């Protein structure tokens, strides 16, 4: 008895249109052939004029731009169908490198002096001081094992969950994402303790004791392992 032919494509109708789940193990040629057959034999009710959005999910298959365009063209040639998105669970090497740069902890040991700017894409672990007039910028969080007396800008690319922490927090200015705060007032007792800065629910930057950080940002425990 012949085995039932493996179905490489599943079509599901949703309120947003159609979702096509494409198998990620068969050959691309086989995939296109079955896609053409299935879209030719299925008739989708409509007024004959409205376009139906198609969302394509290809799983763990990497598609080149040429292959993506082949899929778009095939679907576009069917009645009233237009591709809204093609989603893959696979990322390119360039995307992986960019993600690594944005999420890794970059340890740097130096003093950032007046007029100097230190900028990293990911999380910054600075072992040293930021002098008045110096500036540190990070796409993620900023950790200063030393004195922060200059300007610090965390979440540079828009991450409002980013934080700034320093052994001695006495900055000229703090920035997190697009939120800015002026230098906090000098402590009356002159005490210099480790503190952190974060954006609260009112979209204001708050400076508080460092011990609160694990409660405010539980995910930072993963970064702590990277630091250790």
UniProtKB/Swiss-Prot annotation:
GO terms for biological process: cell morphogenesis; division septum assembly; regulation of cell septum assembly. Keywords: Cell cycle, Cell division, Septation. Pfam families: MinC_C, MinC_N_1. The keyword Ribonucleoprotein does not apply. InterPro entries: CAP/MinC_C, MinC, MinC_C_sf, MinC_N_1, Septum_form_inhib_MinC_C. Gene3D superfamilies: 2.160.20.70, 3.30.160.540. Cell division inhibitor that blocks the formation of polar Z ring septums. Rapidly oscillates between the poles of the cell to destabilize FtsZ filaments that have formed before they mature into polar Z rings. Prevents FtsZ polymerization. Interacts with MinD and FtsZ. Belongs to the MinC family. This is Probable septum site-determining protein MinC. It comes from Bacillus cytotoxicus (strain DSM 22905 / CIP 110041 / 391-98 / NVH 391-98).
């Amino acid at each position: 008895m012949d085995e039932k032919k493996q179905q490489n494509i599943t079509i599901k109708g949703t309120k947003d249109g159609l979702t096509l789940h494409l198998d990620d193990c068969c050959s691309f040629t086989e995939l296109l052939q079955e896609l053409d057959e299935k879209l030719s034999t299925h008739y989708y009710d409509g007024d004959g004029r409205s376009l139906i959005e198609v969302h394509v999910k290809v799983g763990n298959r990497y598609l080149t731009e040429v292959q993506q365009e082949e899929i778009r063209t095939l679907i576009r040639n069917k009645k009233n169908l237009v591709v809204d998105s093609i989603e893959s669970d696979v990322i390119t090497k360039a995307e992986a490198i960019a993600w690594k740069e944005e999420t890794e902890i970059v340890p740097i040991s130096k003093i950032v002096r007046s007029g100097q700017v230190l900028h990293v894409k990911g999380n910054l672990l600075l072992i040293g001081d930021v002098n008045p007039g110096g500036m540190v910028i990070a796409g993620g969080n900023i950790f200063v094992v030393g004195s922060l007396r200059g300007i610090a800008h965390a979440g540079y690319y828009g991450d409002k969950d980013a934080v700034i922490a320093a052994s001695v927090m006495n900055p000229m200015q703090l920035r997190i994402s697009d939120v800015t705060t002026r230098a906090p007032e000098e402590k009356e007792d002159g005490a210099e303790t480790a503190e952190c800065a974060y954006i609260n629910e009112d979209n204001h930057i708050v400076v508080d004791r460092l011990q609160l950080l694990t409660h405010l940002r539980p995910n930072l425990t993963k970064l702590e392992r990277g630091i250790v």
